[in-house]
């Protein structure tokens, strides 16, 4: 029997506009509550952005945010891993010097807000504000007074994998991971979405085989490996499909929502759901 259902957001649960059907989710969460199943949003998005995205349901779910760096259960931050100031300042200097970067088009994701350099392009700030809350321009990252979970940077579709490798090769304590939208997140190399999900399972005494997870991109890989049942969307990368027990429809068809609804439908339920 599943006790926890975790899903990635962009490219998995959300459509191309970053939205979902709230009425359908409300019904799913009511059904999950009856069956003792916890719904978890697991994303590279910031904690602030996730809590805003699910503002109507915050007390009915858990959040694995910042690619596993922050875990919120029952409204409380119960687990976090963050960069030191020395570390994130070094990473900003590295990104600025990268041949794959466009100037200062990168962001620091913190507990209280998100921070971009005052020289970041307007186009980048407009784009990134769709995924982060309280985006602030600062003249120097030295002035940032916040807990920083990760950095995120955008590349072109042609250079994102090269940029990811270039950054990772130059840091001993952090990795760059592709997250979709031609972007990378730079996080501590001890942290993945699995880290946050595993911490959640330990806190709630949930076994791996009781976990169902959905994903599409490489930053979902470890989470799907951890889950007892892994499911990829049709638009997922081949590496993700290869480790999944099932491939469902694309995110544009709200396939994850449909799957969860069918989990609660006695007529459509099959032995895979194990109730």
Role assignments for model-derived ranges:
Residues 36-40, 59-61, 149-150, 209-210, ...:
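Short active-site oxyanion
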Residues 57-59, 67, 170-172, 226-227, ...:
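Short, structured coil segments at secondary-structure junctions
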Residues 94, 101-214, 220-222, 235:
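Conserved acidic, metal-coordinating active-site core of Asp-based
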Residues 60-66, 81, 126-129, 175-176, ...:
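Short hydrophobic/aromatic-enriched beta-strand-loop microsegments
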Residues 20-122:
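Active-site phosphate-binding/coordination module
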Residues 1-4, 22, 185-275:
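Mg2+-dependent phosphoryl-transfer enzymes with acidic/Ser/Thr/Gly-rich catalytic loops
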Residues 3-18:
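Asp-based phosphoryl-transfer active-site loop
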Residues 16-19, 40-41, 129, 189-190, ...:
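Short, flexible loop segments at the rims of nucleotide/cofactor-binding pockets, characterized by
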């Amino acid at each position: 029997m599943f006790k926890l259902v975790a899903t990635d957001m962009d490219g998995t649960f959300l459509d191309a506009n970053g939205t979902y059907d709230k009425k359908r989710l409300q019904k799913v969460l009511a059904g999950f509550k009856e069956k003792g199943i916890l719904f978890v949003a697991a994303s590279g998005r910031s904690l602030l952005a996730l809590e805003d995205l699910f503002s109507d349901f915050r007390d009915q779910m858990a959040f694995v945010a910042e690619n596993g760096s922050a875990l919120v259960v029952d409204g409380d931050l119960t687990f976090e891993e963050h960069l030191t100031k020395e570390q994130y300042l070094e990473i900003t200097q590295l990104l600025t010097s990268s041949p794959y970067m466009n100037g200062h088009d990168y962001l620091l994701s913190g507990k209280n807000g998100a921070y971009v350099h005052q020289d970041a392009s307007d186009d980048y700030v407009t784009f990134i504000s769709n995924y982060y809350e309280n985006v602030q321009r600062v003249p120097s990252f030295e002035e940032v007074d916040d807990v920083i979970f990760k950095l995120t940077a955008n590349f072109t579709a042609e250079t994102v994998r090269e940029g990811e490798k270039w950054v990772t090769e130059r840091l001993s304590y952090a990795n760059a991971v592709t997250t979709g939208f031609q972007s990378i997140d730079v996080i501590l190399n001890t942290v993945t979405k699995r880290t946050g999900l595993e911490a959640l399972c330990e806190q709630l005494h949930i076994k791996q085989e009781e976990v169902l997870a959905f994903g599409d991109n490489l930053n979902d890989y470890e989470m799907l490996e951890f889950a007892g049942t892994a499911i990829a969307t049709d638009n997922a990368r081949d590496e993700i499909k290869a480790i999944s027990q099932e491939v469902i429809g694309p995110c544009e068809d709200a396939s994850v929502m449909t799957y969860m609804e069918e989990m609660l439908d006695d007529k459509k339920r099959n032995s895979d759901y194990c109730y």
